[in-house]
């Protein structure tokens, strides 16, 4: 009786081993299902076809690493190329802008009546009629840019005057 149990267990284990080694697959052909069998290392793919489970298409991490490697190589090549062959600098005309402060105190010469002097936070006084910038002449004789509008040459009115004019 004991040997019968051992033989039964052995046959049952063989049956389990053989059924695990195969995959039972099916698909619909018309209205009825059609069954077929694939090996254990294959996957069912549809109409009676089996594909290997570790095919290159299913390895998403392989494709991800491949794309990251390609992007890294392109980026490294771009930066190496920029380092070895820097872009040529185009000679642009020099544009000199100089800022000069007016001397402290009222300027000598005639003063215009009704034109008050405004002081900047540093305490220097300036004449609103004289421009606070100096354009350096170009070699051709005419300036490279037109002068700024006249309202740019005068400082803004004091706060008290603006408040009084609004009331």
From Swiss-Prot:
Coiled coil: none annotated. The keyword Nucleotidyltransferase does not apply. Keywords: Cytoplasmic vesicle, Endosome, Lysosome, Membrane, Signal, Transcription, Transcription regulation, Transmembrane, Transmembrane helix. Residues 1-21 form the signal peptide. Residues 22-59 are extracellular. One of its GO terms (cellular component) is organelle membrane. Residues 101-167 are annotated as: Disordered. Disulfide bonds: none annotated. It is a single-pass type I membrane protein; Single-pass membrane protein. May be involved in the transcriptional activity of NFKB1. May regulate WWOX role as tumor suppressor. This is WW domain binding protein VOPP1.
